[in-house]
Design a protein with these regions (language model features):
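Conserved HGGG/HGGXW glycine-rich cap/lid loop of the alpha/beta-hydrolase fold
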Residues: 2-41
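Active-site loop/oxyanion-hole signature of alpha/beta-hydrolase fold enzymes
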Residues: 30-63, 101-105
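Post-His helix in hydrolase/transferase enzymes
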Residues: 48, 209-223
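Gly/Ala-rich beta-loop-alpha elbow adjacent to hydrolase catalytic centers
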Residues: 65-74
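Flexible "cap/lid" loop of the alpha/beta hydrolase fold
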Residues: 79-125, 152-159, 181-182, 187
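Short beta-strand/loop motif that positions the catalytic acidic residue
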Residues: 166, 172-174
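Conserved loop-alpha-helix segment in the C-terminal half of the alpha/beta-hydrolase fold
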Residues: 176-202, 209, 221-222
C-alpha cells in the first residue's frame, strides 16, 4: 500500500492529521506525520524540509501531502529525494514566482491573526475557533485550537530557493469554501503554476478535520496510476 507523509501547515502540529491518519491506516496505508520546528524563529523552509527528509529515512517513494504553508515545504523535499507524488492541499504556494495575471489570493473577510513583539503570528483561541474551525464540532475545534503554536513570520521573508515547482507528479486539492484562500485564485494558480487541473473539495480549509474519509478517498485516487490530472 501507499506511504503518505502528511506535513502540517502554519501554527499546527501533527495532531491536525489524526482523523485522516485513522482512516488511512484502516485502509492499510502507512502515515508519517513530521512536526515542523515552528519554535525556531530562525528556521526557513529549507530547515522545515530537512525535518521532513529526516523522517522519511528508509522510505522509498512516499506521497507527500503539504497543507497550506507546507506547499512551500514539500517541493524542497522532492528536490532532495525521490517521491511518487506531491499533493498540494489547500495550498498557499508561498515562495514561488507566480505568472503574470495572478488574481487576489486572500478570501474576502479573512482576518489575519495578531503578530507579537517577536514577529510571531498567533491565534487567540476564540478567534481560531470562530474563524478557522467554525465547521467543526465545538469540542473538536477547541481541542485543535488549544494546540496551536506561534508561527514566526520571518520564514515567509527568507529567500526561497525555487522560482517554480519541481517537475514531479503533482496534484492540487482546494476547498470550495476555504476560509483563507479565494477559490478563484486556487483554480488559477493550479493551472498557471503547476499545469494541473485542480480538484475541488467541499468545505473549508481543513478537510482532514472536516471530512477525513472523503479526503482519504481523493488521496487514494490521485496516488493511484493515472490519478494525476494534467491539463
Amino acid at each position: 500500500m501507499t506511504t503518505f507523509c502528511l506535513v502540517h501547515g502554519a501554527w499546527h502540529d501533527d495532531a491536525c492529521w489524526a482523523p485522516l491518519v485513522a482512516v488511512l491506516e484502516t485502509r492499510a496505508h502507512t502515515c508519517i506525520t513530521p512536526v515542523l520546528p515552528l519554535e525556531d524563529a530562525d528556521a526557513g523552509f529549507e530547515d522545515y524540509a530537512r525535518v521532513v527528509i529526516d523522517c522519511l529515512s528508509g522510505c522509498e517513494a512516499p506521497v507527500l501531502v503539504g497543507h497550506s504553508m507546507s506547499s512551500a515545504v514539500i517541493p524542497l523535499v522532492a528536490v532532495e529525494r525521490s517521491v511518487s507524488l506531491l499533493v498540494y492541499l489547500c495550498p498557499a504556494m508561498a515562495g514561488f514566482q507566480a505568472p503574470a495575471g495572478e488574481p487576489p489570493y486572500q478570501r474576502a473577510g479573512y482576518v489575519r491573526p495578531p503578530v507579537d513583539a517577536d514577529g510571531r503570528m498567533w491565534w487567540p483561541r476564540e478567534q481560531a475557533v470562530a474563524q478557522l474551525y467554525a465547521r467543526l464540532e465545538r469540542d473538536v475545534a477547541e481541542r485543535i485550537a488549544a494546540r496551536l503554536r506561534p508561527q514566526p513570520r520571518a520564514v515567509f521573508n527568507k529567500p526561497y530557493p525555487l522560482t517554480t515547482p519541481p517537475r514531479v507528479p503533482s496534484a492540487f486539492l482546494y476547498a470550495r469554501d476555504d476560509e483563507l484562500f479565494d477559490d478563484r485564485w486556487s483554480r488559477w494558480i493550479a493551472q498557471a503554476l503547476l499545469e494541473v487541473k485542480p480538484i475541488e473539495l467541499p468545505g473549508g480549509h481543513f478537510p482532514m478535520l472536516e471530512n477525513p474519509a472523503l479526503l482519504a478517498d481523493v488521496l487514494e485516487r490521485v496516488s493511484s496510476p493515472g490519478g494525476r490530472i494534467v491539463i
